[in-house]
C-alpha cells in the first residue's frame, strides 16, 4: 500500500505536457521526481498534491481512489505538502507559527504544549522558539515549514523544491531531516531542480 499515480495525463491549450505517467511512493521511502524544465515534473507533482486535476489517470492512497478529493481532504487522509513558496507567518515567532497549527487540532492546552516541545526538539528549533519568522535564515525557515507540515502527522510528505534558495549547510540539514522522516516510515516525494542533492537522499527517482 502507498501513494500511487496511475496513467496521469494533462494538456494545456491542446499541448500535452504529461503523458501516461505512473509512480509509486511507499511508506518509509524517499522518491525523487526529476527532469529538465518542460518535462512535466511540476505538473505531475501538482496532480499528486491535488492542486491540478488530471485529464486522465487516477491517484490512489492505500488503494482508495482520491483523484477527486480536494487538497484539504487529502491532507486529512495523511498527505502533507510543503510548497516552494514560504508558508510561515512572518511576523509570528517560531513557536507561535507552530501553535497556530496546533490550535486547529482537538488537543488540550497541556497536549498542545507537549506537542510543541517535542516538535521544537525534533527539528532543533528550541533555540529559535522566540524568534520572529522574518529573521530566520533560509534553512531555518525551511525547517520551520517542515515542522508545521508534520503537525498533522502525515503518512506521506510532498516537498516542492525544498533545496531551492538555501546554502549548502542548510541543504545538508534538510537532507538529514528527510532521512529521519524515512526512519519514521513517512513516504516522501521530492521534486527539485537540484538533481545531485535530491539523488543523494532518494531511494529511487522518476
Task: Name every feature range the model reports, one short phrase each.
Residues 34-36:
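The feature captures the beta-strand-to-loop junction immediately N-terminal to the Walker
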Residues 99, 110-128, 175-179:
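Conserved ABC ATPase "signature" region
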Residues 132-136, 140:
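Conserved ABC ATPase signature
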Residues 49:
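Helix-to-loop junction immediately C-terminal to a conserved catalytic motif
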Residues 65-80, 85, 90, 109-113:
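ABC ATPase NBD coupling module
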Residues 153:
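Conserved catalytic motifs of ABC-family nucleotide-binding domains
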Residues 157-161:
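Catalytic Walker B motif of ABC-type/P-loop ATPase nucleotide-binding domains
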Amino acid at each position: 500500500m502507498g501513494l500511487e499515480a496511475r496513467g496521469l495525463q494533462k494538456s494545456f491549450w491542446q499541448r500535452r505536457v504529461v503523458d501516461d505517467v505512473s509512480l509509486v511512493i511507499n511508506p518509509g521511502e524517499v522518491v525523487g521526481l526529476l527532469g529538465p524544465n518542460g518535462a512535466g515534473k511540476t505538473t505531475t507533482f501538482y496532480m499528486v498534491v491535488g492542486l491540478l486535476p488530471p485529464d486522465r489517470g487516477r491517484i490512489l492512497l492505500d488503494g482508495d481512489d482520491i483523484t477527486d478529493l480536494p487538497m484539504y481532504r487529502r491532507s486529512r487522509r495523511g498527505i502533507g505538502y510543503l510548497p516552494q513558496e514560504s508558508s510561515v507567518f512572518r511576523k509570528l515567532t517560531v513557536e507561535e507559527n507552530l501553535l497556530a497549527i496546533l490550535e486547529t487540532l482537538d488537543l488540550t492546552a497541556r497536549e498542545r504544549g507537549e506537542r510543541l516541545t517535542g516538535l521544537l526538539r525534533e527539528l532543533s528549533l528550541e533555540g529559535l522558539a522566540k524568534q520572529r519568522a522574518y529573521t530566520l535564515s533560509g534553512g531555518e525557515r525551511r525547517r520551520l515549514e517542515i515542522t508545521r507540515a508534520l503537525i498533522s502527522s502525515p503518512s506521506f510528505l510532498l516537498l516542492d523544491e525544498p533545496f531551492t534558495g538555501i546554502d549548502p549547510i542548510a541543504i545538508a540539514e534538510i537532507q538529514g531531516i528527510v532521512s529521519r522522516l524515512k526512519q519514521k516510515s513517512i513516504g516522501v516525494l521530492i521534486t527539485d531542480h537540484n538533481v545531485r542533492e535530491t539523488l543523494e537522499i532518494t531511494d529511487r527517482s522518476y
